[in-house]
């Protein structure tokens, strides 16, 4: 019995090692959909998320090498934006010190574009297939983010991706179609479990297509 158990564990480990390796980099939105992506791609790929929250693109530049590590990634699906376009004020009582009236913008769109250009240049060195995910929707009433800034920052990101020939997964378009009930609350950028599953479907599809290329 013990021998059989050990054999089954060993075979399972070898099988997992033979699967393509996928890295998802992003903020809490991607943390929300990664488990469903991993479940959808079970048996087809090993899906991992960078440790913790990737926050803004400046943080991404600082921590990217650590997140990539020495792993030979087959696909890297990555996103920044919601933290970059957020306004914060140290005296704000709202979670995350968000305050789009009196706060300071985390990353200008010009700096964001420059940061992404540097990030993509580094990611290309991995030889992984790269997929950029457009930033999801900023809803009306968000305390630290302005409606429409998601479009502006996504346009900047798209310029970078076109320059480098990187595939774009338009999660902004996906989330724009969501009913109010798929957001955790009015004025909140986060999604319910059902909303995250819908995003996961788009992410899984993009990764599957990349693996088949």
Which residues does each PLM region occupy?
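Sec/Tat signal peptide C-region and signal peptidase I cleavage site
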Residues: 12-16
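Short beta->alpha junction loops
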Residues: 49-56
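Residues that form or flank phosphate/diphosphate-binding pockets in enzymes
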Residues: 32, 58-59
């Amino acid at each position: 019995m013990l021998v059989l158990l050990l054999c089954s564990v060993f075979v399972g480990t070898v099988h997992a090692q033979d699967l393509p390796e996928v890295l998802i980099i992003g903020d809490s939105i991607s943390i929300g959909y990664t488990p469903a992506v991993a479940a959808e791609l079970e048996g087809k790929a090993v899906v991992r998320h960078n440790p913790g929250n990737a926050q803004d693109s400046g943080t991404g530049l600082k921590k990217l090498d650590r997140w990539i590590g020495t792993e030979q990634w087959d696909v890297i699906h990555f996103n920044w934006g919601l933290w970059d376009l957020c306004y914060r004020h140290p005296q704000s009582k709202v979670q995350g010190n968000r305050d789009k009236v009196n706060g300071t913008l985390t990353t200008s769109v010009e700096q964001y574009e420059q940061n992404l250009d540097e990030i993509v240049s580094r990611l290309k060195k991995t030889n992984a297939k790269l997929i950029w995910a457009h930033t999801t929707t900023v809803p009306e009433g968000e305390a630290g983010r302005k409606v429409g800034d998601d479009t502006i920052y996504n346009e900047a990101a798209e310029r970078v991706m076109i320059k480098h020939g990187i595939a774009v997964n338009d999660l902004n378009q996906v989330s724009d179609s969501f009913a109010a009930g798929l957001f955790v609350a009015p004025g909140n950028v986060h999604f319910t479990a059902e909303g995250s599953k819908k995003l996961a479907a788009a992410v899984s599809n993009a990764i599957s297509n990349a693996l088949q290329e």
